[in-house]
Amino acid sequence: MKIEVIGCSGAEMPGHNAPAFLLDDEILFDAGSLTSVLDEKAQLRIKNIFITHAHLDHIRSIPFLADNIVVGKDKSKVTIFSISPVIRTIKTHLFNSAVWPDFTIIPNPHDAILNLVELKTGQSIKINGYTVIPYKVNHTVPAVGYLVEDRHRRRFFYSGDTGPSPNTWKKIANKKIHCLIIDVSFPSSMKELALRTAHLTPDLLKTELAKIRPLPGRIFITHPKPQYFKTIKREIDSLKFRNVRILKDGDIIRV
């Protein structure tokens, strides 16, 4: 599996894109910065998008993608997957014909650009040879991470935004995860804010990793605040985990 890091930042600044991870050029996990980075041809290859939660930095590009499709020559369709509360928020507060046109009924309800599909935590769905399972994670709004397995039984887990989530690690125990992409947003000195907003710090990450057995082969950090990137990197390096590193926009992960 090839995962292209379209964006992995915890805040938007020049050179720092909101979260979006593209699997083998065709399946997207979160959609924070899709349309501002990929050209039209690459955008139109994406038919399925899995959303971890409904915060704006994870869904922002979906409206612009729908708009690019409807005005283009290739009238492709895109399916948006997530748990019920996330789908409901996207439908009610985004595609409501007030904030943005309702592309779930455009050009007509029977042939719409967007199809919203609800998932249940712990239940798998098969897409293009991949098995995808959502697992609940701890965040300030309903949120999930995704366990993804290919035909060769290679697996990665993408946490999305998450604070300490011991129940999640119990549920994916013994899955032999080859790659973990996990949120570390703040330096350890900001632990109180991290816990209040349901994110991780390097110290909290260390505690979480102690709960994951077996430990994933490689661990990638996503969602760091650009203002604290150097501090977070220094603290991550001090943990002495040989297989942990912070992602940057444009990175390619091969699982």
Task: Name each model-derived stretch.
Residues 85-143, 151, 242-254:
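Metallo-beta-lactamase
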Residues 3, 21, 29-30, 53, ...:
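Divalent metal-coordination and catalytic microenvironments
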Residues 29-32, 47-57, 81-83, 157-162, ...:
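Active-site neighborhood of phospho(di)ester-bond hydrolases with catalytic His/Asp-centered motifs
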Residues 1-42, 144-160:
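Conserved beta-strand hairpin/beta-sheet module of binuclear metal-dependent hydrolase folds
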Residues 35-82, 178:
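Active-site metal-binding motif and surrounding structural segment of the metallo-beta-lactamase
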Residues 38-43, 64, 125-128, 169-174, ...:
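Short amphipathic alpha-helix with an adjacent loop that forms part of the alpha/beta core around
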Residues 75, 152-154, 213-219:
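Short, surface-exposed connector motifs at secondary-structure boundaries
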Residues 164-254:
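Cap/insert and terminal regions of metallo-dependent hydrolase folds
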